[in-house]
């Protein structure tokens, strides 16, 4: 869900690849994300009632003082998304500047407020961040010329002509794009897909009447489904590792989650108003 619920890094990457507004992308992700959350809550509730799951986390009674302390501890980190989104939506700062504010704010909390980040840990975190950033920048440095070559060679127009020679059905072409993105999402990293296929698929989607923002959110929804689907199943493997659950035990129930998220993704593809509603009324 992180890829469509702001603030989302992959939305920023898509915006830089397509020329879309980062603020519009953030706004467009709220409604599809909310629909997905409601659908998954409904799915979990259905299976909990059907299977009679009565297991629950042990309840603890907190005093008013303890509740106030816990709320205070959680309040400062929870303010970070407000600073980021508020800065972007209000126009005070760009997405890049907002990310710098978030990093500085996190550093202050970790070092001076919670005092959990030592000098050695800071060096380790900084080194990992440099490696991650370097990988992303390397991908962008290769993908940007790739997109330029695609445009110079008129590849999107050739693809558009090819799809018209096969079918003129908007439904079939959108289904093809959705299935292609889902397939790519099963074995490729999301950012790589966004950077590589946006210059090719976005012009085709625009010939079908899809806006840049609508296509972007729809693409991220399809890639989210792919990240749950074998063989890679990045999100599923991560969840299994965190919860100490075997993959083959988790997958049967995950199939229902995949079907639910797929239905939400198809709904987002088919109904532009889901993504365009908030950006339109808040401009």
Predicted regions and their residues:
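Alpha-helical transmembrane segments of multi-pass membrane transport proteins
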Residues: 1-283
């Amino acid at each position: 869900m992180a890829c469509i619920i702001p603030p989302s890094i992959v939305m920023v990457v898509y915006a830089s690849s397509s020329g879309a507004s980062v603020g519009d992308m953030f706004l467009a992700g709220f409604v599809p994300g909310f629909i997905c959350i409601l659908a998954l809550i409904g799915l979990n509730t259905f299976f909990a009632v059907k299977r009679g799951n009565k297991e629950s986390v042990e309840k603890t009674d907190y005093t008013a003082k303890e509740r106030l302390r816990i709320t205070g501890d959680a309040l400062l980190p929870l303010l970070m998304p407000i600073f980021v989104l508020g800065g972007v939506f209000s126009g005070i700062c760009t997405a890049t500047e907002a990310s710098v504010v978030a990093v500085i704010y996190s550093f202050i909390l970790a070092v001076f407020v919670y005092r959990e980040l030592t000098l050695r840990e800071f060096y380790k975190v900084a080194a990992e961040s440099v490696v991650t950033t370097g990988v992303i920048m390397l991908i962008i440095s290769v993908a940007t010329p790739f997109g330029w070559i695609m445009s110079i060679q008129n590849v999107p127009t050739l693809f558009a002509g090819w799809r018209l020679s096969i079918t003129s059905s908007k439904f079939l072409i959108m289904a093809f794009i959705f299935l292609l993105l889902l397939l790519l999402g099963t074995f490729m990293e999301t950012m790589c897909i966004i950077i590589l296929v946006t210059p090719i698929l976005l012009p085709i989607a625009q010939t079908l009447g899809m806006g840049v923002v609508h296509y972007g959110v729809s693409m991220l929804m399809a890639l989210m489904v792919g990240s749950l689907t074998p063989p890679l199943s990045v999100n599923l493997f991560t969840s299994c590792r965190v919860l100490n659950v075997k993959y083959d035990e988790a997958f049967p129930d995950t199939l229902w989650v995949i079907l639910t998220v797929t239905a939400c993704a198809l709904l987002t593809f088919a109904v532009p108003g889901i993504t365009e509603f908030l950006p339109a009324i808040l401009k």
